């Protein structure tokens, strides 16, 4: 019984226990209120269109009556008072449509029964031919900016996976009826260019989005198809300024009503956007976006005109898919540069790569972070000439392009990353110092200016370029991969990405700060590792905003220790990989698998053993200076853990200490300390290893990796 009680979750601090940080509940408007708001917006647009149609009909009818009176008067004068019936045969006529026509652009369920009756009566009154009005789009009918709103996206719109069956791109489960050929709609001519026979990236539309009554037949139309959106926009332009867009077919007004088949609940929960060339309305109450912002943009960029929201506008060129998405050669898996739990990286050309994300939210977060970093770094520091136009700002890699259809982002290409870099020499210690100073500056900039925490500082996420004449020298380094990044709590409900491709706005998820989802298990800062071991449900201990930056720099210190072990161990890199690093990553995979399967207790047990390997790393590199780290960690484990977990911890620590001996690095450490750059890196590692409990996160981040 005592063992079970001792294994319960407790605070990682040796002092008085305190409750973990519990974020306040999210205050989001109810689902019904969001639907009501979108319904009101659509009704306002419909009423504006009907008023425009009625005004045009009245004007044309009056002109028609006046002309008939003139013709009758001339007939009376010519025929001695005999009235003849005349018809206007030389006047081109156009039928002005009311509610029924406009319902092809908005949801039919937003109209009440009374409004439908009014629409039918208006259509009956306007059945005779009339002359169209010449009023412009800037008239009173469309001056509110809601003329011709179209529902552009639903939660079921985007779904992606790779096509392993054939070489030809196909959109599966898309049903076309009414004479349409699925093959023509999938692999045809898009944007005036013929699509290649082997596009490597495939978009799978799992759920039909909307049905249109076309000639009495239900035709399933893919709203995410570029051709259909272009056809709808071209038809609206061809109808002339000030006119109501015509249906896609030649059917009557009653046959043009739109019925949305997607789940309205998930639609309103995620995003529901109506847009045209003047305004983008969103399901976020009080937020409207200006699509004209895209005209001056070439990369994602933050628009700080709004105080309430951080809007990042994401442009897309018309031929982006032909130049990027269809140009990636994925025929051979050996071409793949990297693969992880969040996506794959493939080469595009000599200077660029594309990242194909597994989740759509991954792409949204990446481009939002890219726009935020690019804009905030613009006025901070001038870019080096070699990095201008590459998407690298303040040591942070950003996306230079995005395609939601294929879930692709474009990035600058680097030679390798720190994990795969295998040329480490003491003669190039000055380049290593510059690289880690750049990374520390990037972390401080990301936390202080952008107010975002990266939460995934690992050697795999540090990209480097090396000197081709001296592969041991690191020329530049950049931090990448914002898959786990979260904004500070004061940015909750404020981060939005607006996409030109779909005319939609996406909200960035609020911060959750679950420690089990933050950082790679092998590089997680020791204070957070202890909190997670005690409580798998623990969240980040937010007692002050400076804790975020201190935690990030502590993780960077773990990366520095990882690199120093490769640099200083006299046995060589191969022995380090098979021995030291194998022990560090031995239980990291088990922790990740347990987390995926929801076995949080097993994840906590694996992190306890990883803590033993982290402690062994510090003791090996620091020697006698690491005695305080070892004694404090052992006291923590004995005080907080059960006897069986203590025995497992001691057993694995003994195994690690037999492999990570200080004698293997002692001579190279002396050579390292003989240089100013080596002394700087060694002291930086010592300071980061001194952050061993929750209270240490309240320190001054300027003391870590000082300038």
Curated annotation (Swiss-Prot):
Sorted UniProt keywords: ATP-binding, Host-virus interaction, Kinase, Modulation of host cell cycle by virus, Nucleotide-binding, Transferase, Virion
Effect of residue 137 to C: In strain: Isolate clinical HD-4A
GO cellular component entries: virion component
Biased composition range(s): Basic and acidic residues: 113-127
Consequence the record notes for mutating residue 19 to E: In strain: Isolate clinical E460, Isolate clinical E763 and Isolate clinical TH-7A
A Pfam family matched in the record: UL97
Outcome after substituting residue 95 to S: In strain: Isolate clinical C128
Impact after mutating residue 68 to D: In strain: Isolate clinical C005, Isolate clinical C076, Isolate clinical C128, Isolate clinical C325, Isolate clinical C327, Isolate clinical C336, Isolate clinical CL-1A, Isolate clinical E428, Isolate clinical E460, Isolate clinical E540, Isolate clinical E759, Isolate clinical E760, Isolate clinical E761, Isolate clinical E763, Isolate clinical FK-2A, Isolate clinical GR-3A, Isolate clinical HD-4A, Isolate clinical HR-7, Isolate clinical MG-8, Isolate clinical SN-11, Isolate clinical SW-12, Isolate clinical TH-7A and Isolate clinical TL-8A
Compartmental location: Virion
Outcome of substituting residue 227 to D: In strain: Isolate clinical TH-7A
Gene3D superfamilies the UniProt entry points to: Transferase(Phosphotransferase) domain 1
Molecular function via GO: ATP binding; protein serine kinase activity; protein serine/threonine kinase activity
Active site feature: 456
Family stated for the protein in its record: Belongs to the protein kinase superfamily. Tyr protein kinase family. HCMV ganciclovir subfamily.
Protein name in UniProt: Serine/threonine protein kinase UL97
Organism: Human cytomegalovirus (strain AD169) (HHV-5)
Gene name of the encoded protein: UL97
